[in-house]
Amino acid sequence: MEELFEKVVRTLKDEGLSALSRKTKSYIKTRNIEKQAKNNQVFRDVLFINGCGEELPHPTRYRVTHQREQLEYYGMTSSEVFFKHLSLDMVRLYRTFVFFRCPYTEEINEFILKARELNKKVFYDVDDLVIDTEYTDQIPYLDTMSMEERKAYDDNVRNMGKLLKMCDAAITSTTHLQIELKKFVPEVLINRNTASEEMGCLSEKALRLKKSKSTVDIGYFSGSITHNDDFEMILPVIIEVMTFYQEVRLHLVGELDLPPELLEFQNRIIIHPFVDWKKLPELIAEVDINLAPLTDTLFNKAKSENKWVEAALVKVPTIASDLGAFKEKIVNEKTGILCTDIGEWKNALITLIENSDKRKEIAEAAYQYCKQYCMTYKKGFELVDFLRKHLKKNMLIVLPSFEISGGIMVALTHAKIMQKRGYDVSLACINAKIHWYGDNQQIPVLLMNDKMLDGEWDIAVATMWSTLKNVIEYPKIKKRCYLVQNYETDFYQIGDPLRRKANETYAVVSSINYLTISKWCQNWLKKEFGQECKYVPNGIEYNQFYNNHNERKFDRKKKIRILIEGDCGSYYKNVDESFKIINELDKDKYEIWYMSYNAEPKEWYRVDRFLHKIPYEKVAEVYQECDILLKTSILESFSYPPLEMMATGGMVVAVPNGGN
């Protein structure tokens, strides 16, 4: 709060009330976006992490807001957050991350390491050569900074370069930027700046408000004080035409120092303060000629063609330096005029001042081109295609709950295996209360409903009958799978309506890929439902249960310890029969342990020790302490407890069924 107060005071003192108002609005907007991102917990495709503060709104608008709009037009969802408010938990809520002009921080380093652990890709976006002081040293304005300010600026530049090198690839706005960025990362996409829908609407509105006038207005919309040298380059020409043509007026917009040489024309100079971008189209539309000079430096060659596009959308012709993006995008004498020296600048200005038809001809051609090729809805495919090509396949495994059972453990094991194989794996549950599953190997957990999922999935896997509906109904899934682990119809007694609901999941005709962990399940799925089903064999964590000291030595002087395992609340587990058998045994010879993940023992059960919700990693110790496992469940597709008991050296008494 103290830091925020200091910024308010400094802005008010140095830049005035209008700047404070503008930055306050930007700050509030940014915080609202971040609050939404933290609170809504919605899974989306892309998170843009913005490294520019409220003092630089225009780069953020083009490289974050407009690129987000491009993605939306082509089916990818996104959110944004200011880099200082990035939280580690956000890594589970997105497929990929785009850092825009962000400096390296320890928090971001931790975030990227976690993203790599989860097989998620990280990109860097930058629209200026602010990644190495080799480039920024070419900005003359920086030499006017104090030593303290310059050090802070240079440190920030170096940290941006450091973060860039950590990313998988980069996205940028111009060819020269692409060339330089390839020195830092192996692959760089050029995604040129585009105009948003709102920009288009505001530009059309500004066009309708245009009025005829007797003056010829020239505009220089610098945007930044670092462009002082660019304007000074054409200053002699400006002075000459303003001296000769009395009808010429000069509009200066943004952070620019007015040269003393222009003071004699101050009655024909209109100075506009830095304006909100929404007012810029109307302001540009007031002029007849747009000036876009750039001194010939590598830093300037990397700059985008924004100023040309903004002017073209309100049918104002541009005279620009013949370098960088201007040279690439403007067709000389057709959609603009390109200049290489002062003489050409003079000729271009004279031509457009004297020839209104030429102004209209160039302006119309530029307008038509930019409407066709420079709008977000027209230019999103390459960005979406680039991101999708780089992303690892992602997989959503849908669970009914996280209550431990054999079926849940199987699904979780497959999730771990697929993550180790390089998949971007997430778990989903309707009533998930946790954000992460696992300790040593963490897997993101998401809420499974339409309001909380808004991203694409390559594969989604239903794990129990109750989860198939979610997988079928969520639209953004390329491949739908159903991991059948039992004949769940018989989980319910005759007359229960859930029997029908479970049974119909085995008869889905649509494009569901059936998988199973049991040959028994594979057979009845084919025979009774006509489903071709892939067999995914189960296994146990053998090393967790087996060791060289597992051989039992039954001591006749001690009681034989019998373990009963299963949920007595599920009738098909048939735990009651186990305890009916126990009641026939001699109490003096047999000690009874009962292990359940859910229900507690019934009053009539004879239990010497009750083991409730034992963590899976501790289960082997329970088996090792017991001599015999008694398993009377009537329905098993692949029964883990008998295998695990045998692996620890114990004996098993079980009902013969498909799983035993």
Describe the function of each predicted region:
Residues N332-G343, T351-D357:
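Conserved acidic donor-binding segment of nucleotide-sugar-dependent glycosyltransferases
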Residues T295-D296, N300, I634:
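Aromatic "clamp/platform" in nucleotide-sugar-dependent glycosyltransferases that forms part
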Residues D357-L387:
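A charged, aromatic-enriched C-terminal amphipathic alpha-helix characteristic of glycosyltransferases
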Residues A292, E310-A320, M651-A654:
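Short hydrophobic beta-strand element within catalytic cores of glycosyltransferases
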Residues T194-S214, Y492-D496, K527, K534-K558, ...:
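Acidic anion/phosphate-binding donor-loop and adjacent secondary structure
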Residues L113, M147-A169, N449-E456, G495-T516:
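Membrane-proximal helix-turn-helix segments that form the acceptor-binding/catalytic region
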Residues L47-I49, L209-F231, L235-I239, H251, ...:
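Conserved donor-binding/catalytic core segment of Leloir-type glycosyltransferases
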Residues G254-E286, S596-A620:
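Nucleotide-activated donor-binding/catalytic signature segment of Leloir-type glycosyltransferases, i.e.
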